[in-house]
Amino acid sequence: MSERRIHSVSMDLAGRTLTLETGRFAEQANGAVVVRYGDTMLLATAVASKEPRTDTDFFPLTVDYEEKMYAAGKIPGSFFKREGKPTEGAILTARLTDRPLRPLFPEGYRNEVQIIVTTFSIDMVNDPAPLSIIAASAALAISDIPFLGPVGAVQVGYIDGALQINPPMPNMANSDLDLVVAGTKEAVLMVEAGANELPEEVMLEAVIQGHQVCKQICDLQNELVKLAGRPKKEFVPPPVDTSLEEAIQQWLGNRLYEAITDANKMVRDAQTEALKREVIAHFTADEPEEELEARTAAVSAAFENILYEEVRRMILERGERVDGRGPKDIRPISVEVGLIPRVHGSGLFTRGQTQVLTLATLGSPAEEQRLDDLGIETAKRYIHHYNFPPFSTGEIRRLGSPRRRDIGHGALAERSLLAVLPPKEEFPYTMRLVSETLSSNGSSSMASVCGSSLALMDAGVPIRAPVAGIAMGLITGKDGRWRVLTDIQGIEDHLGDMDFKVAGTAKGITGLQMDIKTTGITYEIMREAFAQAREGRLHVLEKMNAVISEPRKELSPYAPRIITLQINPEKIGALIGPGGKTIRSITEATGAQIDIEEDGRVYISTADAAAAQQAVAMVEALTREIKVGDIFLGKVVRIMPFGAFVNLAPGKDGMVHVSELDVGRVENVEDVIKMGDEINVMVIGIEPGTGKVSLSRRALLTGETAEDRRAAGAGRGLRDGGRSSGSERSGDRSPRSDDRPRPRRR
């Protein structure tokens, strides 16, 4: 075995040391790099197949992000004690890693490439997501796999009005921005962000500042390449038969332009496909059988290249899009709400031939989604799921679990609404939204943002402002010309150079995602894209506000009602009872769902108003602070020769001494009361330390006070005591708090 040669390089990044190391692990991979930042440590490996795949017309890149519980010092909780399928967070990190790397492989490269990023250690301070991009890029950079990197990546926060690079994870709870930017030394490749209604100027400055640091990280990777990089394998792109393309172009004449310039996607696709079949039939007519398959593939590829160039030429030279729109024009918009009975809220958003129906369901706090990603235990009270069935594009496909794309689109729409959600203190409901894509011709994720905003307002959720989303595109020319397109459709997304999605309110941006298919874009292009996106977003909001501009005043009659109580946290144990016995008895008696927070907030959820009031009364009785002078209607639960025990509240009894049962002398307790009787009693004493309660029936009969009875010698040995807590009821919605949800990128 040859001696290992370990190489490492380091730099200071936001006050912490970033280290890249290779040579210690995974020597059989084409490239392997360990990234360490603080005590967060990831291993990235890159492996390429020896031969290209011949059965595909796209680049077969796979990126996997493996979360290992040992990285957080934990054992998996499953029966087999092994990690299971990737969590949603792991899938989103894998997509985040994939997106800036994919454009940097040579055009026509068809060797299968697999990148695996494995978490070795997580310190809960340094976010592993941007480090995953750095690690994967470094592994590719030092490998022999053709790659046009390296790529740097950082996280940018906006805390107390200032941009910060790679803030510690605990600090992100107070940040109005959670942005990851990735890029080469020359240009920005990818942006992903959630924000609290920030203006375009702040977002652009965050991208620019982040990219400046990305350049330094690229320099660090280049240092490692000099120390340990392997020579790149030679890759010769497949030759392009320009003479074939010229012949097809001449034969087509103006027919391709006529076929693709139709506003209806289905008509346009049918005409284009029919024309393609004609071209293939004409240019393969005299081909020998043994060469027919290869010739057909060549003609098909040539036709696609001609289509690609024609669509781009129309936009760059004439500002004309295939559906007749100009660069800034938005497709016709239709908005409807309240279409679906029984659901708690619904919104149908249609833009051109993209249509999304979003449905809202409200639930109790107990229905929050509990997450445990590498030991970071959190709960989500706002959940958005995105579905993309095959009929939405007129296709047939097997149904199954959500694909990575579905999870990514759902997460983008989810974080775009976080900034406008009411705080839990004001609106304690769990909110689940499901966006059903019914028809798709570009930007269904942004239609999901619009549909979510509509459904929330239709459900009566008091969001701070409506949110709309729009997708921008980009066409660039070899001569340096470029045009930004507003509201791109499917063909422009497929043949264009950028997918730039922006969501927000009239005030500012709440969600952002940018993917590039070229080797990067300039700040000037981004500035124009932001400006054009704002115009488009305001146009969409105007259309939405014409139908519903604010949340409904009342919740759906089918939604549960939640009443909030505030109790002394010291009373939580009494409310729960031994083994949950007490709270379970209240739930069984009323049918209400009861949830308790550590700070003493109690949520009572039920659709039955009478049951809700019954549960409130039981909770208040149980958690009420008993004080001297209080009057109770209690039930006699035990009779003794010296008096009777009366139940005042679940789990709390007091004693009426025989001398306090009646005005006159009582020889036999049962001459006055019997087991099961309900009697009115006054608290005349509470024994310090034990909390034993002394009661008097006599005081209520004579009109005396607790002090009068104590002065007469009743409750001897007892002193006024007890703890004061009370049970403060706030109703369905407590006053608005400034503690609103912070943006999440994932």
From Swiss-Prot:
Residues 706-722, 729-746 have a biased composition (Basic and acidic residues). InterPro entries: ExoRNase_PH_dom1, ExoRNase_PH_dom2, ExoRNase_PH_dom2_sf, KH_dom, KH_dom_type_1, KH_dom_type_1_sf, NA-bd_OB-fold, PNPase. Residues 629-698 form the S1 motif domain. One of its GO terms (molecular function) is 3'-5'-RNA exonuclease activity. SUPFAM superfamilies: Eukaryotic type KH-domain (KH-domain type I), Nucleic acid-binding proteins, Polynucleotide phosphorylase/guanosine pentaphosphate synthase (PNPase/GPSI), domain 3, Ribonuclease PH domain 2-like, Ribosomal protein S5 domain 2-like. Its cofactor is Mg(2+). It is found in: Cytoplasm. Its EC number is 2.7.7.8. CDD domains: KH-I_PNPase, RNase_PH_PNPase_1, RNase_PH_PNPase_2, S1_PNPase. SMART domains: KH, S1. Mg(2+) binds at residues 493, 499. GO terms for biological process: mRNA catabolic process; RNA processing. Keywords: Cytoplasm, Magnesium, Metal-binding, Nucleotidyltransferase, RNA-binding, Transferase. Residues 560-619 form the KH domain. It is an enzyme of class 2 (transferase). One of its GO terms (cellular component) is cytosol. It catalyses: RNA(n+1) + phosphate = RNA(n) + a ribonucleoside 5'-diphosphate. NCBIfam families: polynuc_phos, PRK11824.1. Involved in mRNA degradation. Catalyzes the phosphorolysis of single-stranded polyribonucleotides processively in the 3'- to 5'-direction. This is Polyribonucleotide nucleotidyltransferase.
